Swiss-Prot record:
Gene3D superfamilies membership: Thymidylate synthase/dCMP hydroxymethylase domain (3.30.572.10)
Top EC group: transferase
Keyword Methyltransferase (UniProt): yes
Catalytic reaction list: dUMP + (6R)-5,10-methylene-5,6,7,8-tetrahydrofolate = 7,8-dihydrofolate + dTMP
GO terms (BP aspect): dTMP biosynthetic process; dTTP biosynthetic process; methylation
CDD domains found in the cross-reference section: TS_Pyrimidine_HMase
Gene name as annotated: tms1
Any one cellular-component term (Gene Ontology): cytosol
Binding site for (6R)-5,10-methylene-5,6,7,8-tetrahydrofolate: 200
Protein name per the record: Thymidylate synthase
Keywords of the record: Methyltransferase, Nucleotide biosynthesis, Transferase
Stored Pfam families: Thymidylat_synt
Positions annotated as active site in the UniProt record: 171
Residues involved in dUMP binding: 24, 151-152, 197-200, 208, 238-240
C-alpha cells in the first residue's frame, strides 16, 4: 500500500462515520477523534509530499524556516508570496482575539517562538530574543548528538501561559525524536512522532506531513543521522463541510510515487544555515491542484 493511502482512507472514514460538529470558525466540521496514527517512511531521502493534489511546496519550506528561525511576523512570509498566515495576522482577527494592540502580522508567541525561546517574556515580533528562554530546537539537536537514547528529546509548541497571547494556539503542538542505533557501522536513523490536537484534513494536514518530514530530514542532516520515519497522531481530525466536494474529487485519484530530497549544497552544519534554495525536491509529479477555502 502507498503511504498516501493512509491519508485518503482517513478522509473516507471521517466522511462516512464522523460526527457533525460546530466549530470556532463557524464553517462546521465532520470530525473523528484520535484515529489510528499515520506512518510515513522517510528512508532513501523520501518526502511524503502528497501527490493526489499539488501541494504548495514553497509555502511549506518557507513556513518551516520561519519556524526554525523563531520568527512570529506573518508579514515576513507574506512578502515572499506565502499568504497562509495573512488571515490570522490581520488587524480584524487580532482585535477579535483581544490582541488589537499588536501591529498587523504580529502573531504573538506562536510556534517558532516556543521552539527557540520557550519561557521567555514575549514583547512583540520585532524584539530581539537572543539568549532568552529555552532553545528547545537546539536542545533536541544536542541530545541527538550527545545522548541519542534520551527519552526526553521533545519539541513543544504548547505553552498554556502564552496561549492567550497567541493569534492562534498551536495545532501541531508537540513532537518527540527517537534515534535508532544500528548494530553495525551504519548511520543511526532518526524518527519523529508528532501529536496534532486539531487537524484540518483538507488543507492543513498535507502541509503538516511534509513540514515535519522536512524538519526530520534537516535535523538528521545536522546530527549525522539519516531520516527513517514520521509518525503522526491526530486528536480532532476533521473535514470542513465546505471541503467535502473537493475531497471527493481527490479521493478518486491514485497516489503517485513520493519525491526525494536532495541538498543543493554541502557543508550545512547548523539548523539556522538552511535556506529555501537548499531544498531540491526531485521526482514530484502530482495530480492537479484542488482549490479549498481556508476557515479563519
Amino acid at each position: 500500500m502507498h503511504d498516501e493511502d493512509q491519508y485518503l482512507h482517513l478522509i473516507r472514514r471521517v466522511l462516512d462515520t464522523g460526527d457533525l460538529r460546530p466549530d470556532r470558525t463557524g464553517t462546521g466540521t465532520i470530525s473523528l477523534f484520535a484515529p489510528p496514527n499515520l506512518r510515513f517512511s522517510l528512508r532513501e531521502s523520501t518526502v511524503p509530499l502528497l501527490t493526489t493534489k499539488r501541494t504548495f511546496l514553497r509555502g511549506i519550506v518557507e513556513e518551516l524556516l520561519w519556524f526554525t528561525n523563531g520568527l512570529t511576523d506573518s508579514k515576513i512570509l507574506s512578502d515572499k508570496g506565502v499568504k497562509i498566515w495573512d488571515g490570522n495576522g490581520s488587524k480584524a482577527f487580532l482585535e477579535s482575539r483581544g490582541l488589537g494592540h499588536r501591529r498587523e502580522g504580529d502573531l504573538g508567541p506562536v510556534y517558532g517562538f516556543q521552539w527557540r525561546h520557550f519561557g521567555a517574556e514575549y514583547e512583540d515580533c520585532d524584539a530581539d530574543y537572543a539568549g532568552k528562554g529555552v532553545d528547545q530546537l537546539r536542545e533536541c539537536i544536542r541530545k541527538i548528538k550527545e545522548n541519542p537514547t534520551d527519552r526526553r528529546i521533545i519539541l513543544s509548541a504548547w505553552n498554556p501561559k502564552d496561549i492567550p497571547s497567541m493569534a492562534l494556539p498551536p495545532c501541531h503542538m508537540l513532537c518527540q525524536f527517537y534515534v535508532h542505533l544500528p548494530a553495525d557501522t551504519a548511520k543511526p536513523e532518526l524518527s519523529c512522532l508528532m501529536f496534532q490536537r486539531s487537524a484540518d484534513l483538507g488543507l492543513g494536514i498535507p502541509f503538516n506531513i511534509a513540514s515535519y518530514a522536512l524538519l526530520t530530514h534537516m535535523i538528521a542532516h545536522v546530527t549525522g543521522t539519516t531520516a527513517r520515519e514520521l509518525i503522526i497522531q491526530l486528536g480532532d481530525a476533521h473535514v470542513y463541510r465546505d471541503h467535502v466536494e473537493a475531497l471527493e474529487v481527490q479521493l478518486q485519484r491514485e497516489p503517485r510515487p513520493f519525491p526525494k530530497l536532495r541538498w543543493a549544497r554541502d557543508g550545512i552544519t547548523d539548523i539556522e544555515d538552511f535556506e529555501y534554495s537548499d531544498f531540491v525536491i526531485e521526482g514530484y509529479n502530482p495530480h492537479p491542484s484542488i482549490a479549498m477555502k481556508m476557515s479563519v
